[in-house]
Amino acid sequence: DSQWIFLPAIKRTKRISSSNRTGKFVSSEFSYEDLGSEEVADNDYLWLADMPCPTDESLSCAQVESYPKNPRSGYSKRVSYTDLDEYRVHKIEFYNRRGDLEKILTFEDYSQYLGQYWRSHNMIMENIQTGKSTRLNWGEYSFRKGLTEQDFTPQALERYSR
């Protein structure tokens, strides 16, 4: 599973090695692992409870632990809070390999696209151990643009930047 990042400032594409997925993403509180995609089969799950959502108590959330199967993961587990009405993730707690709470990711300002896709416009990652945080703001999402896997090769990413 290759992971690449395009760096527009230097107009280059860089491969992220699997051993660096736990490293910081451009000096932020996010790691490359935090920003990558994953499949349901990549984790084992344990439902803990249905409870009020920690970010909006008027909503009910499922509290679920997930345990990564990948031994190279930087986390021993994650605890997520997903609302039961629209299945939007509101918060994820990340526990390091020693089992200590390391970071909390909070999702804010959701919008629905094409009548079905909920996306957060603000993601705040707080490092509990250092007190530092990083906010990612997303301005606009686009769907159904006809992109293929070939549009995301390192060569294509560099070509589109010209």
Model features per residue range: what roles?
Residues Y32-T55:
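Surface-exposed beta-loop interaction hotspot
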Residues E149-R162:
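Short, low-complexity, Pro/Ser/Thr/Gly-rich segments in the mature regions of secreted, periplasmic
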Residues S2, F6, R12-S17, R21-E38, ...:
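Gly/Pro-enriched, hydrophobic low-complexity segments
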